[in-house]
Swiss-Prot record:
It catalyses: L-proline(in) + Na(+)(in) = L-proline(out) + Na(+)(out). Keywords: Cell membrane, Ion transport, Membrane, Sodium, Sodium transport, Symport, Transmembrane, Transmembrane helix, Transport. Catalyzes the high-affinity uptake of extracellular proline. Important for the use of proline as a sole carbon and energy source or a sole nitrogen source. The keyword Ligase does not apply. One of its GO terms (cellular component) is plasma membrane. GO terms for biological process: proline transport; transmembrane transport. This is High-affinity proline transporter PutP. It comes from Bacillus subtilis (strain 168). InterPro entries: Na/Glc_symporter_sf (IPR038377), Na/Pro_symporter (IPR011851), Na/solute_symporter (IPR001734), Na/solute_symporter_CS (IPR018212), Sodium:Solute_Symporter (IPR050277). Belongs to the sodium:solute symporter (SSF) (TC 2.A.21) family. Disruption phenotype: Deletion of the putBCP operon abolishes L-proline utilization. The lineage of its organism: Bacteria, Bacillati, Bacillota, Bacilli, Bacillales.
Length: 473
């Protein structure tokens, strides 16, 4: 990872290179880096653990995420890649929103930049906590030592190599994750007697393990499906669309990305189900279902291979941290410092400050992670919904609706974020996932406020028409 960071450093000469890789990513790197940045440790721990605990009824979230990711690639990716270049060659989402609506007040950039800065700092901190806990629980290493190792490696390649380093390392980490999720279920099924014996063993534990509706409700299924809506508003994922070489490569990237995601998710599901059969055959019990991937690795493989499997989990955690860290740095430098205080700042100054911002945000996140605070980990439970509801409808409508105004965009972001926070803190999330009311409220706010406020200027309308003409070619 550090070697990749060094090579990326040698190829980084200006702010666009540092924050967006000079829009030079190929389809494979774009696809796998987006996937690795998205999934984090949940793919190798949370999802197999859910399958081990509840069976296939936990798979609804996988279906929702796959549909959301597919729609994101199909409808958002080509349009965002085209429009960000038309709108002042924007290199951040807040910058795109300001340029898209010709916002001279800078409120859009300021508000969205602050939201990204605050929430992603906690998000990064939660990733650091996960890394420290992994070192502590698997290797018996002191939590704080593990924290320093994860933070040190991620900060080093992100700080020096910027977007290219993050994308290339995410690509490698995506391959490691994929290989691990194919290897573990295959070997597990081999040791449980093949597919037929494995299925029979699982049915002997609980015949309803294969009932996808077990313990679910209509609202529960809708809530799990709604996770897919979050993709439209995740800055660390959709920024990958802005960095691909050309719009023509997005179709290939979509196929690679969705293939990786679906096969990896299936591997995670089969790992959990295979774990049920393996443990039951041998009369074994497991205290923490989320460790089933790690435990199978320890039992079934040579220590060298086990080390590779553990590195896959670390790769998942690190890829998400680095992506979120860079987006946070970008907002701090491009959307707050340059936009508000130093519009004449040189690229050299901004790249230096970008690296400084990576270090500063990392230090703050490390301090927050030091005490292994459960409140920080709890924040992540609705941060996905917060970004999805505040940015998702705004990004979608900005790409499709000419009449949308800057005031509509601002209202959508504020109402979406506020609805998610209020809904979650009112204890209503068990009834319905906060993404749904947040997304709906944001969508309605954008529409009604845009209709009730002055239409976009002729310059903004002309830019939208130019973008539409390019898309139709």
């Amino acid at each position: 990872m550090l070697l990749i960071g060094y090579f990326a450093y040698k190829r980084t000469s200006n702010l666009t290179d540092y924050m967006l890789g000079g829009r030079s990513l190929g389809p494979a790197v774009t696809a796998l880096s987006a996937g690795a940045a998205d999934m984090s440790g949940w793919l190798l721990m949370g999802l197999p653990g859910a399958m081990f605990s509840t069976g296939l009824s936990g798979a609804w979230i996988v279906i929702g995420l796959c549909l959301g990711a597919w729609a994101n690639w199909l409808y958002v990716a080509p349009r965002l890649r085209t429009y960000t270049e038309k709108a002042g060659n924007s290199i951040t989402i807040p910058g795109f929103l300001e340029n898209r609506f010709g916002d001279q007040t800078k409120l859009l950039r300021l508000f969205s930049g602050i939201v990204i800065l605050v929430f992603f700092t906690f998000y990064v901190s939660s990733g650091m906590v996960s890394g420290g806990v992994l070192f502590n629980s698997i290797l018996g290493m002191d939590y704080h030592t593990g924290l320093w190792i994860v933070t040190g490696v991620v900060v080093a390649y992100t700080l020096f190599g910027g977007f290219l380093a993050v994308s290339w390392t995410d690509f490698v980490q995506g391959i490691i994750m994929f290989a691990a999720l194919i290897l573990v279920p295959i070997v597990t099924f081999f040791h449980t007697g093949g597919a037929g014996d494995t299925v029979a063993e699982i049915r002997s534990v609980d015949p309803d393990m294969f009932n996808i509706f077990k313990g679910t409700s209509v609202l529960g299924i809708i809530s799990l499906f709604a996770w897919g809506l979050g993709y439209f508003g995740q800055p660390h994922i959709i920024v990958r669309f802005m960095a691909i070489t050309s719009v023509k490569e997005i179709k290939r990237a979509r196929r690679i990305g969705m293939g990786w995601m679906i096969l990896s998710a299936v591997g995670a599901v089969l790992t959990g189900l295979g774990g049920i059969a393996y443990y039951h055959q041998r009369g074994m019990t497991l205290k923490d279902p989320e460790t089933i991937f790690i435990q199978l690795g320890n039992i079934l493989f040579h220590p060298i291979i086990t080390g590779f499997l553990i590195s896959a989990i670390l790769a998942a955690i690190m890829s998400t941290i680095s992506s979120q860290l860079l987006v946070t740095s970008s907002s701090l430098v491009e959307d707050l410092y340059k936009s508000m205080f130093r519009r004449s700042a040189s690229d050299k100054e901004l790249v230096f400050l970008g690296r400084l911002a990576v270090l500063a945000v990392s230090i703050v996140a490390l301090v927050l992670a030091w005490e292994k605070n459960n409140t920080i980990l709890g924040l992540v439970s609705y941060a996905w919904a917060g970004f999805g509801a505040s940015f998702g409808p705004v990004v979608l409508l900005s790409l499709f609706w000419k009449r949308m105004t800057k005031w509509g965009a601002l209202a959508g972001m504020i109402v979406g974020a506020a609805t998610v926070i209020i809904w979650a803190n009112a204890g209503l999330s068990d009834f319905l996932y906060e993404m749904i009311p947040g997304f709906a409220a944001s969508l309605l706010s954008v529409f009604f406020v845009s209709i009730l406020t002055q239409a976009p200027s002729q310059a903004v309308t002309d830019q939208f028409n130019d973008y539409q003409d390019t898309m139709s070619q």
